[in-house]
Amino acid sequence: MTNTPAPRARRSVLSRGSWSETARIAGILRKETVGGAVLLVASAVALVWANSPWAESYFALRDLKIGAEPFGLHLNLTLGTWAADGLLAVFFLVVGLELKREFVAGDLRDPARAALPMAAAVGGMVVPALIFVAVTAPVGDGATRGWAIPTATDIAFAVAVLAVISTHLPAALRTFLLTLAVVDDLLAVTVIAVFYTDEINLTALGLSIVPLALFALCVQRRIRSWWLLLPLGVATWVLMHESGVHATVAGVLLGFTVPVLRSVAAGGPEAGPGLAEHFEHRLRPLSAGVAVPVFAFFAAGVAIGGVSGLTRALSDPITLGIILGLVVGKPVGIFLTTRVLTAVTRANLDDALRWIDVFGVALLAGIGFTVSLLIGDLAYGLGSDRDDFVKVGVLTGSLVAALIAAVLLRVRNRHYRAVWLQETADTDRDGVPDVYQSQRD
């Protein structure tokens, strides 16, 4: 008699990760919550000011030129451009550090765990882009150039929504949302570098490699002196800006050079965190609390022109394409990709979750703000009529996506609270919740 082998247990997707990873992500989201609140205030101030009797002073401030052109470098820029090209480089530097850490020591280092958020991010990029192109293609005259606008996720805005509705989102969903946003940022940087670069100065681009390589050499040798690293970083940014490639790409490349783990010569991973964590700890408050809100202040201000102006903006195909892309395309792309990949790999959703939870998180990912506004500026030009339509579309689409997500997640909050109580219970008071200890056992 032959023994029938026992059926293999199905793999579970969106399951709870390790305690160290969960604690790290919780810390990041706490900081992003504060940054999200500042971001919302800055955007609200810009909108009110731009539609007040003093609107001219807002636009005069945004368009005020500051800088010089030493050695022929084009650095005499408006304050709005300094915010978009300069301050956002700090944001993308943190993105680079985050990406490097995820690929080296986070969820993305494991192909099995990385496949789902990476595929979901791609799905969440393709579907809204297709919707935008379908809506704007009949217009012609370069309207489809903004196809990438509704493809981005603003994690600070998303976690601010979570804070407002006081939901206890399970650790697995928080991890999925953050990882999704990180991959989204990687895709956004790639899109900006490839599709929104018109002319390239190869000499400046080649020269930018020199300070970038010196920066990499310093951080690999664990040199932390900002007196040395800051000039090298600024030089990389200036030359990248001069090359025609969007200068925020320099931030990501600088972040990629920073080591996540300590080298053997420095004591190895057991000796403590690598330089990437140290830099991220220092730079994230600057990014979330200053760089992104200041950019939002200069980018979100749009003169709506009363009810008639709002009606005109909302009826424009560019505005409609963005709203539909964010509210419909983004969540549907993420949800369907996740559902299909789960079915194809014959996996099961974690027992603590339901598919409605995944759709709620996918709706949060439809909140596209910072990067969406940046791509709008690049696609149509800062201050143009179409750029104003982009702002109305991004603000409206993000607000609608946030409201629907808030309602959906709030309905499930009783269940989330039960999961949260289980995930935070620490009966032996050793600082590690019991569920994570049982995972190790």
Curated annotation (Swiss-Prot):
Keywords, ordered alphabetically: Antiport, Cell membrane, Ion transport, Membrane, Sodium, Sodium transport, Transmembrane, Transmembrane helix, Transport
Top-level lineage group: Bacteria
Any matching Pfam family: Na_H_antiport_1
Protein's membrane topology: Multi-pass membrane protein
Entry's localization field: Cell membrane
Regions that span the bilayer: 34-54, 77-97, 115-135, 146-166, 176-196, 199-219, 225-245, 249-269, 290-310, 317-337, 355-375, 389-409
Protein known as: Na(+)/H(+) antiporter NhaA 2
Lineage: Bacteria, Bacillati, Actinomycetota, Actinomycetes, Mycobacteriales
